[in-house]
Structures are given as structure tokens and as C-alpha cells.
Amino acid sequence: MRNASQLVAFVNAVAMCFAFTPAEGLPLPACFDHLSTSDTDRKWGWMWGWKDELPEEKRLYYGPVLARKPTFVSMRFLPVLYATFGRAGEADDHLEDVRSGRLSDIARRIIELVTQKGEVQTRRMRAELGITSREGRTQYGKALDEVQRLMYVARVKAVGEGREEYNYTYDLFVRRYPEIVRAAEPIASADARARALARAVKLAGGLTEKQAAKLFDWGEEPLRRAVERLAAARGVVRLERGREAIVVLRRYADAA
């Protein structure tokens, strides 16, 4: 790949991939491995612009989705990943994740601020939340990743010129991508998780259950049900290898 259109075509073909470098121990595609240059600076130069430009145009989705790393998702596959959360579409959907500990209090405040204010810049958001200390900024950065990973909040666009002014605007996922939310409505969360896992296994050829857990962070029981669902449909085979279970495509089972 050497231009934005080729990147879009690549992501459409794989459905989801790491936006930059691979994640350690996770054999899924990473864009840096498919760029038509070996120059690291050029790779970053190309990708840094594309990861702002293409999501703003809604040609790709970008966020910390897989293994909490920067991820590209095709617009066709995005409803499947959104449906894995099984949201009711209510304004207080996030409170269950707060109670369960999946969202921090700062994450809750970010969601509620964006709900009230609409699309808002990072700098203004921090100011509105009263975050000024170094520790507070670190916690805020982690919380912003949390709300994007769980698809409560989505990045909209880059704004500002130069290093000092450069930042992003964010809005609620449901306001930024209403068409994705509508497309996700008919997909049951269990079906969505099975489809997402099937795609990951197809891309990798096989994954240990530990790798799948790191990739999606669904929790032990939803992951177990997704594996069972795929195995029942004869899409994958679950193999015991010592203390670890491996989920592989059926056609690779004999070689695993």
C-alpha cells in the first residue's frame, strides 16, 4: 500500500487490523507490514495523515479497539463490533459498565459531558472536567481510550495547526455513527461476538483462548459462548494443548 485508497481497500478486505505495528503475541494483520516502503519514518508519515483523514471522511473507523491498540475497522464490519456490546440505546447505557468497573469515574464524566455539550475538543473537555495535574491528565488519557474502546465516544476530526494546537474533537458514538447503530440493531450480541471471533480466527488461522481474551476483552463467559457457538456451526475446532485451548479453523485442525 502506498496511498489512502489502497489502505481503505486493504481494511475492507480484512475487516479489522492494527493501524500501525503488530500487537505482541497476536497474529493479526498490522498496516506497517503491508506498506510499500521499508523506511520507518515514511511509514509513520503516511499513516499519521491517513488515520485522521479517512475516519473523518467515514471511509474507515479508527480507535483503540483490538487489544486496546490503535485499530482500523471497515465500515461494513463496524456494526458487528458495535453489536458485541449489546446496548439498549438508552442514555444511561454506560452506567452498567461503571458499576461493573469496566468504566472509570473519569470515563463516566467524559460520556456525560459529551452527551451534554456535543462534539468537543480534547483541550476544552479537559478544562470542563477540571483536569490540570500530570496525574489527572494521565488518568484522563486512559479514560478517553476506555470510552472509545467500548464505543461510547468516537473521534470526529483533527483540529489545530502545529504541535501545541493539534488535538481532536470527540462526540458520542451514536451521534457520530447513527447509521452504524441502526445497522447493528438486528444483530444479537452473541451472534456479533461469534462473527468477530470467527473473523479473527480466519485472519490468524488460529488463536489461543488467552489471545482471543486479550484481543476482545469480553470476559470469560461471553468468550466461552462465542467459541461454543462457532464450534457448533462447525466453523472452528477447539483443541486442548496442555494447559491451553486453541481455536483453529476446521481445515487446519489436523495440523494443529
PLM features per residue range, with description:
Residues 1-256:
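Long, low-complexity intrinsically disordered regions
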